[in-house]
Amino acid sequence: MTRKQTPMTLALCALGLFAASAASALAADAPMAPPKSEINAAVGTGAKFTPPPESAIPDDDFGKMVKLGRDIMLDTPKYAKDYVGNTLSCVNCHTDAGRMAGSAPLWAAYVSYPAYRGKNKKVNTFEERLQGCFKFSQNGKAPPLGSKTLVALESYSYWLSKGLPVDEKVAGRGYPNLPEPQQAPDYVRGQKVYEAKCILCHAANGEGQYVNGETVFPPLWGPKSFNWGAGMGSYKNAAKFIYANMPYGMSYSLSPQEAWDVAYFMDAQERPQDPRWQGSVAATRAKFHDSKFSLYGTKVNGKLLGDIGAPKPR
């Protein structure tokens, strides 16, 4: 039996960065995709592509792999448990089961690879890009190339992209651009936004909410969230995601300044160590976080962020 989440519940749970629906989190069988908002992340992206509906998944061996990829997207700790080190699921960053333009949709990502990535300074295949998601956003370990987990996710992404020309600049890819704010992002202002619009879902300390051990609303920081190496560890990336996708079901309801401020506040909290640890916070920041949009290795409220020792072995 699947528990339902009412529209009122969604309306109340404002600004849950990574807000996953209770329906997908608590499904007993195959997970269900959270509903799309009437005003969603696709607005303003210029995207004209519509991925095929789930009803069009073929009823054959390939279709079974596509469905497994979809299930991994919606409940990653359940369907890819060997490679996950936290309680997040892929759908928390890629809404509508990876279909939504402006929410880093899988169909746009699939046609954008292979591509050079500054993050690891080499050309990455699509499977290698997926490996990074498990290593950083899932705070786990990379599934081997050719593994069933990666083949399933790649199959699902390929199926979503059918009919879309290969183009690394396809409209709707990633998150919509958000210009830097007139005022520098601020911790105190961000805390006020969080307390007004996030706390009901994600709790006072960003720990999220759970029912019977299942994630209903995922953690935004702390030991069960993404690690310092994840893309959301850049408060610029986080601000873009928040502005276009949150509050869940209420996209673009925050001002750009509010999105920047609350992203800064979220990324000013402690989380698991960057797995690329270089032996010290200073060395790790110098090699991987030398950006004004990363708070890793900086002091916030007297605390040196990232000063938690070496990462735990996976």
From Swiss-Prot:
Pfam families named in the record: Cytochrom_C (PF00034), SoxA-TsdA_cyt-c (PF21342)
Gene3D superfamilies (alphabetical): Cytochrome c-like domain
Signal peptide positions on this chain: 1-27
Post-translational modification: Binds 2 heme c groups covalently per subunit.
Record's catalysed reaction(s): 2 thiosulfate + 2 Fe(III)-[cytochrome c] = tetrathionate + 2 Fe(II)-[cytochrome c] + 2 H(+)
Class of this enzyme: oxidoreductase
Binding site for heme c 1: C90, C93, H94
Any one GO MF annotation of this record: heme binding
Main subcellular localisation: periplasm
Location of this chain's protein in the cell: Periplasm
Keyword Nucleus among UniProt keywords: no
A GO cellular component annotation in the UniProt record: periplasmic space
Sequence positions that bind heme c 2: C198, C201, H202
Ranges for domain Cytochrome c: 58-192, 185-270
Enzyme nomenclature, EC number: 1.8.2.2
Keywords: Heme, Iron, Metal-binding, Oxidoreductase, Periplasm, Repeat, Signal
Function: Catalyzes the oxidation of 2 molecules of thiosulfate to tetrathionate, using TsdB as an electron acceptor.
Subunit structure, as described in the record: Monomer.
Entry protein name: Thiosulfate dehydrogenase
